[in-house]
Amino acid sequence: ALNEIVEDVQTPVEVATVRWTDEGERESMTEIFSAVGMGLTTLIYFFVMSYGAMVMQSVTEEKTNRIVELMVSSVKPFQLMTGKIIGIGLVGITQMLIWGILLVAIISIAGVVSGVAMFDPSQAAAISAASQMPDADLSMQILSVVSSLPLAEIAVLFVLYFIGGYLLYASVLAGFGAAVNDPQDTQQFMMPIAVIMLFAFYAGFYSAMNPDGPLAVWCSFIPLTSPMVMMIRIPFGVPLWQEALSVTLLFGTALALSYLSGKIYRVGILMYGKKPSL
């Protein structure tokens, strides 16, 4: 009797999740929502890490080579720092746009090729048979779920968190870069930032399993973690007030840190010979 109970408990159960929309009830797939969120989170993570580190390296090199002494004679230090952050950020956005255009082009070409293949009589029977297979049904189900996503909302919020997260971390790293005298000293400042971003990255992936859990909700409001965590939660549906509060806190903190980093930058870029410390 005990063995039968254990076997019943271990019986696999398929649970269909349902998402309510303005048009009514629609079946949803958690895996697709998670995949979309994880993809966007990964983009933000690698963009902020790569181009934020580039800002820090650029500031450090200019200070080490004393190039910055010539620059500050023409522009204010805060303007120089802001221009550097915006310039490198625009380079990154341009690169992302190129990748996006190439991806759309590849998908379009693949669609045209598959459309031409459908008119080939020799493949008509094979295509007709394949359409009856479970894989075809799964593809249609995936397309249906993707079409039910708030794509416009996801796109707008992705851009906002993309820009806000970059401005926040790039401002901090620019201030750190101005405080060091040797590029090798940047490691002690880069490590805490890397740890925070890794925590935000893994917190985002954990939130995919429980997007409305306490960790996911609280990390959505913390500016250092919200860009990664919120992009995981948005495909599942997030209240408007949470989105508005999260974006407001992110940009407010980014502006405050930009101002503080500007103060550090103004003093640090012309300070030599002192060992930086945390």
Language model region names:
Residues 1-46, 50:
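Transport-system extracytoplasmic interface segments
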Residues 2-3, 106, 110-278:
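Membrane-spanning alpha-helical segments of multipass transporters and channels
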Residues 17-33, 69-75, 80, 222-229, ...:
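Long, highly hydrophobic alpha-helical transmembrane signal-anchor segments
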Residues 26, 30, 34, 38, ...:
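Membrane-helix interfacial "entry" motifs
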Residues 35, 51, 55, 63, ...:
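Helical mechanochemical/support elements of P-loop NTPase systems and associated helical scaffolds
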Residues 42, 46, 54, 58, ...:
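Residue-level hotspots within the lipid-embedded alpha helices of multi-pass solute transporters
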Residues 52-77:
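Transmembrane helix boundary and interhelical loop/hinge segments in multi-pass membrane proteins
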Residues 78, 82-99, 103, 157, ...:
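Alpha-helical transmembrane segments of multi-pass membrane proteins
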